[in-house]
Amino acid sequence: MIDGYSPVLQSLLGTLLTWGLTAAGSALVFIFSSGQRQILDGSLGFAAGVMLAASYWSLLAPAIEMAENSNQYGSFAFVPAAVGFLVGAGFVYLADQLMPALGFSEDPYSIATLNQDSKPIKEKDEGDLYEDKELSIRIGRGGFHQDKIENGDVYQRKRGTVSPLAEDFSMLNPREAAHKGGSSWRRIMLLILAITIHNIPEGLAVGVGFGAIGKTPSATFENARNLALGIGIQNFPEGLAVSLPLRGAGVSTWKAFWYGQLSGMVEPIAGLLGTIAISLAEPLLPYALAFAAGAMVYVVTDDIIPEAQACGNGKLASWTCIFGFIVMMSLDVGLG
């Protein structure tokens, strides 16, 4: 993010920063154990506060100002912001609803068995499938294990439950087992899609922010830079929120890190698309800014805050959310 360069390059640099901070957060899986939930919940609360502040000062406020300066809406200058905000929230909601249609209603047991190959299970290994407790996880906002603990938590089933892996593989010949293994990897790819899909609006927000520079007095390079920094800050604990539960479920540390940073890889692509689209359709800019804000606020209220509150650390998450809001507000007002 260097002042004076084209919006496309600025957007690329900004979203590469947000991706890099996602990877940095995911790398904490090498340091923290899966049992240190307080750190994760406090970080998620801080991220929620940062995103809420950024959604107003870096997105909604410029959108309203652009509508007012256009002299097209008069006293209804709030309409583009309201419409864009609603459509942005609806976009993320519909993306959530699409997940079950893609197969997310199935038990994602394959996540806990990423290190296993697809050959049939031998008799001596079958006993391992009936352990005292079986670990699994939930990631994202999909509908996995609705009767269990909230998203991102490792939960334990009671003894005596037969592993789905045993049900699927124990009686299969090698060809059938290989087919089942391919199906498991398909579900893994779908799960990665669920993890990354809500990062698309964040990448769009950065791209739209840089594409809007100079359109109004409040649409400045500093505001766009602060928005990218804010989203990068909230991506830091988000990377850990993906990698830490995977590690707790038995996935190797390196694979947990890989899948954690992968969730931020989509942001540079979305950011570039946002900048290019705004350059081609400038009248849509107020709607686009509000769209990004609505998507971000929906993610915060539907995903980040509930997950931060799910494990008994609600007060900690609430206060770190307040602190995150103040930090981002100070960045936007003081450095904008």
Curated annotation (Swiss-Prot):
InterPro entries the UniProt entry points to: ZIP
Topology relative to the membrane: Multi-pass membrane protein
Pfam family for this entry, one: Zip
Cellular localisation: Cell membrane; Nucleus; Cytoplasm; Golgi apparatus
Molecular function as annotated in GO: zinc ion transmembrane transporter activity
Regions that span the bilayer: 12-32, 44-64, 75-95, 188-208, 258-278, 280-300, 316-336
Cellular component GO terms, alphabetical: cytoplasm; Golgi apparatus; nucleus; plasma membrane
Keywords noted in UniProt: Cell membrane, Cytoplasm, Golgi apparatus, Ion transport, Membrane, Nucleus, Transmembrane, Transmembrane helix, Transport, Zinc, Zinc transport
Chief location of this protein within or outside the cell: membrane
Coiled coil (residue ranges): none
Domain of life according to the entry: Eukaryota
Protein family membership: Belongs to the ZIP transporter (TC 2.A.5) family.
Stated role: Functions as a cellular zinc transporter.
Name the record gives this protein: Zinc transporter ZIP11
Species the sequence originates in: Xenopus tropicalis (Western clawed frog)
Gene symbol of the encoding locus: slc39a11
